[in-house]
Amino acid sequence: MSGLHILAFGAHADDVEIGMAGTIAKYTKQGYEVGICDLTEADLSSNGTIELRKEEAKAAARIMGVKTRLNLAMPDRGLYMKEEYIREIVKVIRTYKPKLVFAPYYEDRHPDHANCAKLVEEAIFSAGIRKYMPEVPPHRVESFYHYMINGFHKPNFCIDISEYVSQKVEALEAYESQFSTGSDGVKTPLTEGYVETVVAREKMFGKEVGVLYAEGFMSKKPVLLHADLIGGCK
């Protein structure tokens, strides 16, 4: 199959939406192919069920224009550095051949988010090694970036989502079981104005870069600009 332009990994369905739903909506609108891979079924979530979370994830994907969404059904709160997990992620990377890969940032209050980042980084490296899992052809990812979930970190670069912030909110609100308390739900950090907090963060990043709303990202290596510093073409 032809490769994806972007493949975003999350520990749980809704992680990717929190960090970069606006960016995904922006690029799918421009015709780029974007995929999402959730590592767990979030079966230990305080609210919702596995079946409901899957339906919510499908709805959010439709809102963002994502046609490819996978779930590897790894254990919730069990994302440790295991070879079997790395191999599963390598298979996904080699199958979908993404140009860019995104994962959560390492610094996050939820250990699964940080461990997801580490597993994906290991898998990206191994995916490019020809003799590692030789039954599947290798694939080298061009760039690896991190999005934010619970943190307010200083980003290395931002993407303008001013025209897509409403889609981001809509994608997040698709996870009704997580961001609102139903009759049988319990209060969690996600149900107490979490979506509003995320939007406020993107507004703050937007203000810092001179737009209405922006999503912030981190990169281990320098990012090459595709426009010069005074706004012209490279």
From Swiss-Prot:
<dbReference type="InterPro" id="IPR024078">
    <property type="entry name" value="LmbE-like_dom_sf"/>
</dbReference>
<feature type="binding site">
    <location>
        <position position="15"/>
    </location>
    <ligand>
        <name>Zn(2+)</name>
    </ligand>
</feature>
<dbReference type="GO" id="GO:0019213">
    <property type="term" value="F:deacetylase activity"/>
</dbReference>
<feature type="binding site">
    <location>
        <position position="113"/>
    </location>
    <ligand>
        <name>Zn(2+)</name>
    </ligand>
</feature>
<keyword id="KW-0479">Metal-binding</keyword>
<dbReference type="GO" id="GO:0046872">
    <property type="term" value="F:metal ion binding"/>
</dbReference>
<keyword id="KW-0378">Hydrolase</keyword>
<dbReference type="Pfam" id="PF02585">
    <property type="entry name" value="PIG-L"/>
</dbReference>
<dbReference type="InterPro" id="IPR003737">
    <property type="entry name" value="GlcNAc_PI_deacetylase-related"/>
</dbReference>
<dbReference type="GO" id="GO:0016811">
    <property type="term" value="F:hydrolase activity, acting on carbon-nitrogen (but not peptide) bonds, in linear amides"/>
</dbReference>
<comment type="similarity">
    <text>Belongs to the PIGL family.</text>
</comment>
<keyword id="KW-0862">Zinc</keyword>
<dbReference type="InterPro" id="IPR023842">
    <property type="entry name" value="Bacillithiol_biosynth_BshB1"/>
</dbReference>
<comment type="function">
    <text>Involved in bacillithiol (BSH) biosynthesis. Catalyzes the second step of the pathway, the deacetylation of N-acetylglucosaminylmalate (GlcNAc-Mal) to glucosamine malate (GlcN-Mal).</text>
</comment>
<protein>
    <recommendedName>
        <fullName>N-acetyl-alpha-D-glucosaminyl L-malate deacetylase 1</fullName>
        <ecNumber>3.5.1.-</ecNumber>
    </recommendedName>
</protein>
<dbReference type="GO" id="GO:0071793">
    <property type="term" value="P:bacillithiol biosynthetic process"/>
</dbReference>
<feature type="binding site">
    <location>
        <position position="12"/>
    </location>
    <ligand>
        <name>Zn(2+)</name>
    </ligand>
</feature>
